Amino acid sequence: MNSLATQFKELPDPDKRSVHLILCEHALSKWREYCATQRRIDYVETVCGTHQVVDTELPADALHSAREGCDIKNVAKRYQEPIAAIQDDNLTFPDPIEFAYYALYNLFHKYAAQEIVDDWLIVNQALSSEEDESQRRTQLETAIQRAT
């Protein structure tokens, strides 16, 4: 994957953005597959002891906001509680799903909130949403080809 990483890092910014969007579409599909298997995703936030229900549409809204280049549907505010809960271990997902969630979160911050986020971090997280490690290289190759 090293030569692919180098290939990605040498892309112009608009092509990197395209790769990010392509890979995060896949991450979103993994998120949606997971959500479809859950009746409801909820947790207890330990600071105040409140019961929270996960907003399963938030990652899709994050992707949409990233595409548009601005925060649509108050995504930044909606992410505050679940990200804190993940960091506090109040909310847990299987590793690939957590990677998908973070990939979409970081994509949002880079392209909608215009924050500095490492380009490779988004790629790595989005690829890690794929449980089948043998597919990751092909995913990145395909995304780079489609973007250029």
Predicted regions and their residues:
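Structured binding/interaction patches within domain cores
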Residues: 1-148
